[in-house]
Amino acid sequence: EDVRSLLGFSSTRFTWRVSGVSFQIMGLGNGLGLCQYGARGMALLGFPVDEILKFYFTGVELKQLEKPTYLKPLIGKTIVLDPGHGGDSGGSGPMGLSEGYVNLEIARALAALIIKDGGNVVLTRDKNEYVSLSERVRISNENKPDITISIQQNIFPDDQVGGTESFYYPGDIEGKKISEYIHRELVTALPLSDLEVKQADLFILRETNNPSVMVKVACLSNPQEERLLSEPEFRQKVAKSIISGIEAYYHD
């Protein structure tokens, strides 16, 4: 009578039967992965994806990946910056400006812009010290970056020679594209002669396992260009030109 009243049946003559029984059993398994049949069964029972994964993999947490946006175009990208020379390595200009110092200051300014764009940055050196070429390559390859950018200056016997040039390794298709984008921004923004984009069999370009470019920003041996390189505003303009080239490459 209680059942009839609870279910609202008008008749006292009714029967019932069990239509099905469901068991959830954790198998013996080797615990190395997901069972597609078990996972499908849980899905049919209405379990959400994160609960199914947690059932098979301890400590798993689903997170929504960030995607590049107009304001953060480098999200998910890692870029290795290689400030050339350092320590007693490298030359200096007529006024005594050290190439290692200039390269590091430009790299630091560029690193800040990359981070602002949402990217990750690895520096092959972050102070005025000597780092061997093989160590620079090791740092780059170990971090598996999307791009490696080596920042250097030219020093020529003739102090009247000046300009900016960029290099990529022969056959590095993406390296060529990146160097062209960066170089275009540099020659557009800076009051320097265009020494063009060139192929070069340079150690840092050859031995890195990712698209790599070398930017020779200016000629430190040229007194006028040394003066420019000594100015923080000019170095910031260089960094902005390089980041603009990187952004253009990823927007293409």
Describe the residue ranges of each PLM region.
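Short glycine-rich His-centered loop
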Residues: 77-96
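Short, glycine-/Ser/Thr-/acidic-enriched flexible segments
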Residues: 28-29, 86, 220
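Active-site-proximal helix/loop segments of hydrolytic enzymes
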Residues: 77-78, 97-252
